[in-house]
Amino acid sequence: QTFNNQNTFKVIDLKDANEYKFKVRANKANVACEESDVFSTVTTPKRVSNKSVKSRSRRKITYSFKKVNATGYEYQWSTHRNFKYNFKTKTTKSTRVTIKTAQSRKRYYVRVRAYKLDENKNKVYGSWSKVKRVKVR
């Protein structure tokens, strides 16, 4: 595309969790200059939807969520709804996890987000899912 007198541009309608590569070339009076190096970016993954969170046995929480186009998932659990303190974070490639370190008879909150790795192996995160609550047996 051609952009007159602009140093920035916006590309729309990109798919979630995909890598895109761009090259830029300046034109002046119908004379094309050299192309730039390749710029690479990864779009953020879609927000993950929760399926279920249950505690069927003592000290265990089973948490499942829907699969999205992503490299993996990061999930958190806490005894506080806002996750400001007293929370733990782990990563997984599965859409079903079991948390085995919960305390009996306590209420826990869990959430998850997807991530995609860019070409430099940096994680690009999607939004956190809605927070789900469970009481441990």
What is each model feature region?
Residues Q1-K15, E74-Q103:
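Recognizes extended acidic, P/S/T-rich segments that occur
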Residues V11-N30, A102-N120:
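Beta-strand-rich modules
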Residues D16, V31-V68, K123-R137:
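Pro/Thr/Ser/Gly-rich low-complexity, intrinsically disordered linker/stalk tracts
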Residues P45-K46, K67-N69, T79-R81, T101-Q103, ...:
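Non-catalytic surface loops within mature trypsin-like serine protease
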